[in-house]
Design a protein with these regions (language model features):
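Jelly-roll (double-stranded beta-helix
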Residues: 1-217
Length: 217
C-alpha cells in the first residue's frame, strides 16, 4: 500500500502495525496466512481530508506461497530517490533496482516498483528487462507512453513483454507508478482473498483460515 495523501493505519496477526502517511509504504507478505485490517488513522478521521493511496497485490511463486507472514513499514525517508536526467523529475525505488539503487521492500521474485514524479514537457526513456510484465498507473496528470498511447489520471497502461525500452512524455506535471516483474508462468487460482496455484490449495487455505491458523488480531 502506497499513500499519496492522508493516513492509513494497519494492524495484523503478526502483531505488527502502525500509521503511514504521504510517501510511506506498507509491504505485507501474506504467505502461509495472515489477518489484517486497514483503516483511516484516528487523527485523520477526526480532521478529515483527502485519502489517496494505491494498493498492489504481488503473486508469490509457488515455492514461497507458505512463507512466514511478514510486514514492513517503509517510511518516506527509507525510500531512495533518484534524480532523473535532463531535469525530468525524480524516481523513488520502492522495490527492485534502478541502476545501482536498490529499494527497501523485500520481494520473493524479481520485480520493480518505481514511483515517478515527472515535470511537464519532460521526455524520459527507461530500460526494462526483456520479457518482463510491465504496467503503469497515472496517479496524477497525464503522459504519453511510447509516443502513441496517451494516459490520464487513474488510467492503467499494460505494455507488451517484447522490447526493453519504455518512453514517457509528460503532458503535464505527472505522478506515475510503474510496476514490472519477471513472469512466474504458474497457474493462478483465486477465491475471495485467497490466491494459490490450485483449487486444492484454495480449499486448504480456507480450512486453515476457519481453524484459526491465520492467528488473531
Amino acid at each position: 500500500t502506497i499513500v499519496y495523501s492522508g493516513e492509513v493505519e494497519h494492524r495484523d496477526s503478526t502483531g505488527r502495525g502502525g500509521v503511514i502517511g504521504p510517501g510511506d509504504v506498507q509491504w505485507m507478505t501474506a504467505g502461509a496466512g495472515i489477518l489484517h485490517e486497514e483503516f483511516h488513522s484516528s487523527a485523520f478521521s477526526q480532521k478529515g481530508g483527502e485519502l489517496k493511496m494505491m494498493q498492489l497485490w504481488v503473486n508469490l511463486p509457488a515455492k514461497d506461497k507458505m512463507a512466514t507472514p511478514g510486514y514492513q513499514s517503509i517510511t518516506q525517508s527509507d525510500i531512495p530517490v533518484v534524480t532523473l536526467p535532463d531535469n525530468s523529475g525524480t524516481l523513488r525505488v520502492i522495490a527492485g533496482r534502478f541502476g545501482e539503487v536498490t529499494g527497501p521492500a523485500h520481494t520473493f521474485s524479481p520485480l520493480n516498483v518505481w514511483d515517478l514524479a515527472l515535470r511537464q514537457g519532460s521526455h524520459l526513456t527507461l530500460n526494462q528487462p526483456e520479457g518482463w510484465s510491465t504496467a503503469l498507473v497515472v496517479v496524477e496528470g497525464s503522459v504519453t507512453v511510447n509516443g502513441t498511447t496517451p494516459a490520464g489520471e487513474a488510467q492503467l497502461v499494460v505494455l507488451s513483454q517484447s522490447g526493453d525500452k519504455l518512453h514517457l512524455e509528460a503532458s503535464s506535471d505527472a505522478k506515475v507508478l510503474l510496476m514490472a516483474g519477471e513472469p512466474l508462468n504458474e497457474p493462478i487460482v483465486g477465491y475471495g482473498p485467497f490466491v494459490m496455484n490450485s483449487k486444492t490449495e484454495i480449499a486448504e487455505a480456507i480450512r486453515d483460515f476457519n481453524s484459526g491458523r491465520f492467528g488473531q488480531i
